[in-house]
């Protein structure tokens, strides 16, 4: 039996919740928070999930492989449409071509913007069963992650091949005035013809970015840039420094970059600060690779070593250095000694001696004076929640909480490390801001990490409660169906599904498909729906699967790495009622950037009250006879109008106040009473 290791918490200067601008919870959310606390204390959340078993055997196991014709399995989730990528964004002759990976999603009006390592696609999804390509731009520069704000589109560019002119020929010089690494800003007023208005260069490029809105600044938006590439040469971008901070106080290490975008003049966007949010963190130990992977890598390495190949260890795994890389290194050694012609045996011996230390420096980061290994030097992704003045930073070896009340100067206020986490990847807050979920992208997203022997706490989600100065670990969640060695699978991007009274999330797991799960009780998360396909290839791993699965105005939209765009609908079940789905569909937003998390607010509606009734029934939170009477009273009031409806609802709310004291789920009955009272107030 293995023992779970407890995450280690570091906290610095966390502001009280009352002290954060905009942090006070509206009455309805305060009631929701009380529900969450009640669930954790009483176990009512587990009762909500009781008696609704997932299908057995799991239909996701053993699915037929295929590119566009793989077998599919689903439970409580219906595939509405799959739209293949247009020709310019796929290689029809090479499945899994890394140059044409579909990446993240952003939403505006009837459009979803889908990033692709070769550019952007803008889909009209007003008819979810038949999406239409409304606009596109071929512009290589992986990952091309996207965000939108009004008529502006923001795109992350990190690849060395990215060009200012969006050319497809790449950039081959080590230093070039043509290279673009940073954040592109496009005007998409005419979605059919996206137009670049600014290229904001950054020292490490932009692997991901976070669009941050500020309640106190409506003239600007801010972009938090997370760059994971090596620091650029100052000969290419002035001011860039890859030295240790003790060698150069302006080092790019341990920082993010903040871009201010004046909305009236986006062409004037520029980097305004470089907060060192990672400074002072110690190196965080993580788990080794799976024993099966270590043994398999050693066998491959032994065979390659016997043939004269160069072998190094990367994160504990033997890796064979590619001939292109070693060839360049050997040529450099010939030039270093002033020689010409082919490398000699002495050159090869020198490379063997120097290669492992070189790789260690590349992957382990800088070593500080005294041989101290610091924590991570960059973040992978940040999720901002402006309404509560906080952001969650997923920063390789740590999960962070940031104070973003001054959006140009985010400040770390808490950090947590977990030896079960390999690579902190992304974050999601609960709607009330009192819980936070971090994902672990163990294996980097291109490895199979959901096999039957992979530990359930590795490559999973970690769920925490968040109370002022304290992050408290609760549990892990991992998509439960074992996948094959030919399917890249690990926790990736997802968003909340706006079901009132519950914390539900839809999440992409690459070739593990889409998993929808309830984490209202963070100590006991539970899958309630899924969709999955078989592997791309039954004989080898070809990268594919759901990069992101996001709820948007009634549907779950998924960016499928190799197969295009999926749109899915939740189906009613014992774990999620039609009333709950309909209540979620009441929430409509004009734009959505999941990493700029916005507070979910439900309108006063009878279906919201009925959703709470369904939850009370599922969890045995109110006596059955009393619940029947409440439903009857709601139905009667809905048929009424004017003063009669108002009086009926006010009377019912008062009765529910009295019911709460003896109910098994007091907090949810109070929430229902609040909703009924809101309905009375909305009646004219």
Functional labels for PLM-detected ranges:
Residues 579-684:
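Soluble extracellular-acting proteins and domains
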Residues 1-25:
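N-terminal secretory signal peptides that target proteins for export/translocation
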Residues 9, 17-18, 28-29, 133, ...:
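Intrinsically disordered, low-complexity segments enriched in proline/serine/threonine
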Residues 48-615, 629:
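Feature marking well-ordered beta-strand scaffolds used for ligand recognition
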Residues 19-20, 26-41, 46:
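Bacterial N-terminal signal peptides
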């Amino acid at each position: 039996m293995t023992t779970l290791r407890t995450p280690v918490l570091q906290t610095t200067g966390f502001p009280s919740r009352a002290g954060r601008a905009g942090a006070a919870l509206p009455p309805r959310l305060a009631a929701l928070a009380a529900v969450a606390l009640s669930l954790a204390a009483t176990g009512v959340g587990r009762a909500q999930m009781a008696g609704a078993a997932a299908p057995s055997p799991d239909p996701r196991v053993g699915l037929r492989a295929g590119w566009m014709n793989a077998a599919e399995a689903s439970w409580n989730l219906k595939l509405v449409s799959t739209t293949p990528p247009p020709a310019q964004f796929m290689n029809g002759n090479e499945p899994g071509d890394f140059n044409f990976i579909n990446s993240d999603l952003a939403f505006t009006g009837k459009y979803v913007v889908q990033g692709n390592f070769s550019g952007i696609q803008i889909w009209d999804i007003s008819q979810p069963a038949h999406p239409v390509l409304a606009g596109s731009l071929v512009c290589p520069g992986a990952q091309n992650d996207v965000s939108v704000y009004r008529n502006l589109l923001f795109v992350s560019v990190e690849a060395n091949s990215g060009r200012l002119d969006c050319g497809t020929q790449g950039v081959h010089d080590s230093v070039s005035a043509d290279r673009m690494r940073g954040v592109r800003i496009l005007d998409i007023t005419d979605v059919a013809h996206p137009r670049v208005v600014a290229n904001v260069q950054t020292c490490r490029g932009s692997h991901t970015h976070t669009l941050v809105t500020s309640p106190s600044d409506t003239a600007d938006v801010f972009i938090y840039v997370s760059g994971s590439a090596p620091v650029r040469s100052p000969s290419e971008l002035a001011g860039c420094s890859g030295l240790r901070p003790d060698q150069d106080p302006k080092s790019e290490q341990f920082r993010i970059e903040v871009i201010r975008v004046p909305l009236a003049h986006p062409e004037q966007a520029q980097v305004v600060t470089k907060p060192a949010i990672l400074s002072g963190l110690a190196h965080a130990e993580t788990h080794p690779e799976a024993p099966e992977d270590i043994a398999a890598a050693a066998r491959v390495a032994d065979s390659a070593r016997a043939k004269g190949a160069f072998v190094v260890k990367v994160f504990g795994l033997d890796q064979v250095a590619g001939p292109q890389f070693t060839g360049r290194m050997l040529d450099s050694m010939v030039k270093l000694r002033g020689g010409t012609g082919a490398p000699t045996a002495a050159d090869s011996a020198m490379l063997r001696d120097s290669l492992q230390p070189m790789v260690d420096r590349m992957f382990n980061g800088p070593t500080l004076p005294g041989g101290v290994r610091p924590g991570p030097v960059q973040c992978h992704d940040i999720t901002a929640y402006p309404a509560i003045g906080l952001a969650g930073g997923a920063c390789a070896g740590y999960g962070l909480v940031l104070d973003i009340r001054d959006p140009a100067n985010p400040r770390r206020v808490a950090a947590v490390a977990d030896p079960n986490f390999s690579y902190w990847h992304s974050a999601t807050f609960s709607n009330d801001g009192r819980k936070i979920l971090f994902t672990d992208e163990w294996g980097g997203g291109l490895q199979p990490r959901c096999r039957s022997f992979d530990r359930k706490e590795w490559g999973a989600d970690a769920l925490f409660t968040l109370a002022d100065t304290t992050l408290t670990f609760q549990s892990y969640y991992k998509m439960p169906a074992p996948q094959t060695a030919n399917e890249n699978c690990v926790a990736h991007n997802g968003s909340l599904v706006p079901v009132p009274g519950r914390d539900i999330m839809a999440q992409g797991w690459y070739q593990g498909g889409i998993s929808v799960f309830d984490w209202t009780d963070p100590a006991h998360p539970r899958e309630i729906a899924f969709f999955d396909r078989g592997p791309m290839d039954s004989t080898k791993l070809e990268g594919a699967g759901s990069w992101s699965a996001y709820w948007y105005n009634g549907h779950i939209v998924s960016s499928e790495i190799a197969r295009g765009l999926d749109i899915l609908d939740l189906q009613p079940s014992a774990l999620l009622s039609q009333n709950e789905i309909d209540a979620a569909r009441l929430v409509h937003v004009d734009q959505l950037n999941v990493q700029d998390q916005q507070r979910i607010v439900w309108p006063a509606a009878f279906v919201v009250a009925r959703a709470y009734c369904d939850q009370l029934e599922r969890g045995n939170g109110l006596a059955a006879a009393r619940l029947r009477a409440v439903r009857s009273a709601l139905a009667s009031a809905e048929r009424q109008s004017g003063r009669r409806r108002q009086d009926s609802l006010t009377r019912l709310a008062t009765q529910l106040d009295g019911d709460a004291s003896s109910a098994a789920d007091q907090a949810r009955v109070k929430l229902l009473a609040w909703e009924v009272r809101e309905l009375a107030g909305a009646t004219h």
